[in-house]
Amino acid sequence: MPGSNHFPLLKFYLENPGYDYYWVVEDDVFFTGEWTDLLKCCQHRGADFLSSYVRDYKEEPDWSWWGSLSGAEEIPLESRVHSFNPIYRLSSRALAYVHDKLSQGWSGHHEVLLPTLLRYGGFSVADLNGDGGLLYDETTHSHLPLPTGKRKPGMIYHPIKEKTPGCLALKRNCVIAAVGKNSLHREWRKGKTEPDFDLHLIVYDQSFNCIL
């Protein structure tokens, strides 16, 4: 199911359960300040789940993924909550609860599954823009391409992506490879002629920042 990127987080949590809080940050998120300051800004906030654009069904009934949530019991649409999760924080006890619920058969897009299950289970769910602070707005943090212009200090920006042509020409072949630190995939594209394949990588170890 699309929106299942909470599973790598849960795997890490189960292998490393000693933290109080776990932050997830997509690789196209940028903060115009010190990341340490961002974490400190949220340090005094005890919410089990912190994210952005936290909305209930009444506020945004046309959101696409409300119906993806399913499990052992029915949570009415009016009781469901969604968030926007390019950057979010979960407490250790919240992750333990989510893991338990998934083990019972719950599933859904993580932007509805996480906030809904947690609020329904009595955990605290809060917006990053709470307590009078402003860490994002619609001009800095969105699912749409951002307008160009001067960046505001101390704000979360998303998406930070390079623009690509609207009709990207695909090669005849697609090579999908699971790669790690000692991968030889760089050699595959060397040669005098342009290779007739697109290369897509699945990184299976901790070498994310040095794999290309």
Q: Each predicted region: which residue ranges?
A:
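Active-site-proximal specificity loops/subdomain of glycosyltransferases
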Residues: 1-17
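Short beta-strand-to-loop acidic/aromatic patch adjacent to the donor-nucleotide binding site
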Residues: 19-28
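Short, amphipathic alpha-helical segments
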Residues: 3-6, 29-33
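Short, hydrophobic/aromatic alpha-helical segments in well-folded domains
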Residues: 8-11, 24-25, 34-38, 113-114
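Short, surface-exposed basic-aromatic patches at helix termini and helix-loop junctions that form
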Residues: 14-17, 36-45, 119-123
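C-terminal catalytic/acceptor-binding lobe
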Residues: 99-210
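Conserved catalytic core of nucleotide-sugar-dependent glycosyltransferases
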Residues: 31-112
